[in-house]
């Protein structure tokens, strides 16, 4: 109610199914929570979907029209709870499929490059991720 009255766009960010209390890792749950809220959107994290074994294209389609910003990752494996980030286009996630679906939806929000690896010097890999987004 507060967001609607004050023109504030709020977004729910999902996390993987780390514990039984967290069911908002599932995009269907988030969609159900926000469907009637005018100013409440989703901030989906495709890396957490991957860790939970949820296909990101399915997630984006489920949340269509209610996505404010995207936390975008590529990961070494799909469905591995202890997954590792890799530069975009070099991992197991369907990066082109995700981008194509977001384009199809007319998504005009922000892509947040979320690279959680190479903690001592992540910049070269983050630049690769940025270049991948520019090309695709």
Predicted regions and their residues:
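Anion (oxyanion) recognition and catalysis
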Residues: 4
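Aromatic-lined carbohydrate-recognition surfaces of secreted/lumenal glycan-active proteins
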Residues: 8-21, 43-44, 51
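Histidine-acidic metal/acid-base catalytic patches
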Residues: 23-27, 31-44, 50-136
């Amino acid at each position: 109610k507060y967001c609607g009255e004050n023109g504030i766009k709020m977004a729910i960010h999902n996390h993987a199914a780390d514990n039984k209390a967290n069911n908002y890792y599932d995009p269907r749950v988030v969609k159900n929570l926000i469907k009637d809220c005018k100013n409440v959107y989703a901030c989906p994290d495709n890396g957490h979907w991957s860790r939970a074994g949820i296909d990101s294209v399915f997630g984006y389609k489920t949340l269509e029209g209610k996505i404010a910003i995207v936390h975008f990752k590529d990961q070494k494996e799909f469905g591995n709870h202890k997954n590792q980030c890799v530069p975009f286009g070099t991992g197991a996630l369907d990066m082109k499929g995700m981008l194509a679906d977001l384009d199809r939806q007319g998504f005009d929000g922000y892509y947040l490059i979320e690279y959680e690896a190479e903690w001592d010097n992540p910049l070269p890999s983050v630049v690769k991720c940025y270049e991948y987004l520019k090309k695709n």
